[in-house]
Amino acid sequence: MRDNTIGSLIWLRLIRFTNQSNQMSNEFLKRFDLTTAQFDVLLQIRTYQPLTQMELAEKVTVTQGGISRMLTRLEKEGYIVRKQDWKTKTISLTEQGEAALERALPEQLAFQSSFFDDVLNEEEQKILYELMTKVHKHSEKKELPKE
C-alpha cells in the first residue's frame, strides 16, 4: 500500500463504491422490472424529452451500441416512443413509461440517498457533493498523459 498515493486510493474507493451501489441498485430495481441503466435512461428522457439518441447517449453511462439495444427493449415494453421528424429521430416517454418511472422514482431516490444519509450529516454531504463536482468538472477536461 505504500506505493499508492491518496489520489489512487480515492479512485479505488470510488470505483468500488460505484460497483457495489450499482449492484445493489440493480437488485433493488428488480421489484420495478428495471435495471439501474434503464432507470437512468427513463429519467434522462423524462427530463430532456424530446431528445435524440445521440443527446441521450451523452447524458448516460451506456455505450452507443448499448443505448440502441436498450431503447429497442424499452420501446417494445411500451415505455418510450421514437418519432421521425424529417432527418431527426427523437425519443419521448409514453404514459406507460412515465407511470413506470413514477412507481420507481421515490423509492429509488430514497435508496440512493440512504448510502449517504446513513453515514453523513447534511454539511458533510454538501462538502462531498462540492468536492465530487470539482473532480468531475476537472475530469471532463483531463487529457491522457503523453507517451
From Swiss-Prot:
Example of a GO MF term: DNA binding
Induction of its expression: Up-regulated following infection of host macrophages.
SMART domains (alphabetical): HTH_MARR
Pfam families assigned: MarR
InterPro entries per UniProt: ArsR-like_HTH (IPR011991), HTH_MarR-typ (IPR000835), WH-like_DNA-bd_sf (IPR036388), WH_DNA-bd_sf (IPR036390)
Residues within the DNA-binding region(s): 53-76
UniProtKB keywords: DNA-binding, Transcription, Transcription regulation
Note: Deletion results in virulence attenuation.
Protein's UniProt name: Uncharacterized HTH-type transcriptional regulator BA_1941/GBAA_1941/BAS1801
